[in-house]
């Protein structure tokens, strides 16, 4: 059974390890200086420990950590930015990310709008988010051969 577990400060090294493993292939393909693969330890620690309204959740099956999801919410807990969805490569394509997103929505039932951005040229990621109810809002060029697509999901409750 898949479940979410909130990460704490002591989980920093695990988060860094998962983030690097999950984004290595994307970084190698696009060589983007803002790729999560390159995010430094202190910035990740700040997001995990100090940044207000920033939440990391491990996606777990039994006691095995499959990956993590990171969101940033507004004060009212009505809007959220899905900042990082990191599923370990050996677990990708098996439904863990979709189930993690579904559980995250249950964890934050007051959030009515979910936003994110991903690499437009990475068709698999765009299709993954569309399958999970996200729709494109706009595209911004990042660099030659790489554009960021912004996506939104509205929850009617």
Where do the PLM segments sit?
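A short helix-loop-beta-strand connector motif used in the catalytic cores of GNAT acetyltransferases and
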Residues: 45-57
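Conserved active-site alpha-helix within GNAT-family acetyltransferase domains
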Residues: 98-99, 106, 121-139
């Amino acid at each position: 059974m898949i479940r979410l577990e909130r990460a704490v400060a002591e989980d920093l090294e695990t988060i860094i390890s998962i983030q690097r493993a999950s984004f290595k292939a994307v970084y190698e393909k696009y060589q983007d200086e803002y790729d999560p693969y390159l995010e430094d330890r202190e910035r990740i620690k700040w997001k995990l420990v100090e940044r207000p309204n920033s939440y990391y959740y491990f996606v777990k099956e039994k006691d095995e950590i499959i990956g993590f999801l990171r969101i940033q919410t507004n004060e009212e807990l009505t809007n959220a930015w899905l900042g990082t969805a990191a599923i370990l490569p050996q677990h990708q394509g098996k439904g863990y990310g979709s189930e993690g997103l579904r559980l995250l929505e249950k964890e934050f039932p007051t959030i009515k709008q979910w936003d994110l951005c991903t690499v437009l040229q990475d068709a698999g990621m765009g299709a993954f988010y569309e399958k999970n109810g996200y729709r494109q809002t706009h595209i911004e060029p990042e660099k030659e051969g790489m554009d960021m697509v912004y996506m939104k999901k509205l929850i009617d409750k």
